[in-house]
């Protein structure tokens, strides 16, 4: 299977790329460190369009949501089944005034609002008849380069658990 992953160089995106590659899947990695920018929505969507699965992981303002719409609409004419996994956050379940550890209140609200935008778009598209199958993934505290809380789930274990629940060809 050909799989596009935004933000594949660090954190959860990197772990998805590693584990899926180890399972024999071809990874199309899209990352700022490779000179890509998901804010260039049409260009990024053109890299994703030939793939079977899009793991929509990277966040850059509201580009993650814009990219979801763009890819979903590009895949509509196809009869083949495609998949989009949107990586959101459990923070969307929190009280709107909750502060994320390590972020200011303003940064916490911006992050939550961007992910809520993604979730609303996800539910809107998921409700429509389509050959594009959607999955929303809401990680809680996952131990990555950015989050090192001792109570957090190790990123390799978290991704392994997500993948064990999926049927990938």
Name each model-derived stretch:
Residues 130-137, 142-169:
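C-terminal helical subdomain
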Residues 59, 63, 73-128, 140-145:
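Catalytic loop of short-chain dehydrogenase/reductase
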Residues 41-42, 53, 62-73, 113-120, ...:
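Well-ordered, non-membrane alpha-helical segments in soluble/globular domains
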Residues 2-5, 54-55, 84:
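Conserved hydrophobic beta-strands of the Rossmann-like cofactor-binding core
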Residues 3-5, 23-32, 137-138:
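Short, hydrophobic beta-strand segments that form beta-sheet elements in well-ordered domains
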Residues 4-23:
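N-terminal Rossmann NAD(P)H-binding glycine-rich loop of SDR-like oxidoreductase domains
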Residues 50-51, 81:
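Local beta-strand N-terminus motif with an aromatic residue
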